[in-house]
A protein has these predicted regions:
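Short basic helix-loop element that most often maps to the first helix and adjoining turn
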Residues: 5-24
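Short, Lys/Arg-enriched C-terminal cap helix and immediately downstream tail that follows
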Residues: 8, 44-45
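DNA major-groove recognition helix of helix-turn-helix
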Residues: 10, 36, 54
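Residues within helix-turn-helix
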Residues: 19, 30, 59
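Recognition helix of helix-turn-helix/homeodomain-like DNA-binding domains
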Residues: 27-41
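DNA major-groove recognition helix of helix-turn-helix/homeodomain DNA-binding modules
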Residues: 45-60
Length: 65
């Protein structure tokens, strides 16, 4: 299972809303919400876009449990 710390990274690296992250990475706010709640696993491309936007390594946000 893949879990994430997206909400923590989103708030600490720019205090961005779900909608702001979604707009900047090219997906819906609902997608970001689903990722944060571990209901959806993002594609590698989307995960990389999120990490780049938040200036963190992908493995700092997404990890296997």
């Amino acid at each position: 299972m893949i879990e994430n710390k997206l909400k923590i990274a989103r708030v600490t690296n720019g205090n961005l809303t779900q909608a702001e992250v979604a707009e900047k990475v090219g997906c819906s706010r609902q997608t970001i919400n689903s990722i944060e709640n571990n209901k959806f696993v993002p594609s590698v491309e989307l995960a990389l876009r999120i990490a780049q936007l938040l200036h963190v390594r992908i493995e700092d946000i997404f990890f296997l449990t």
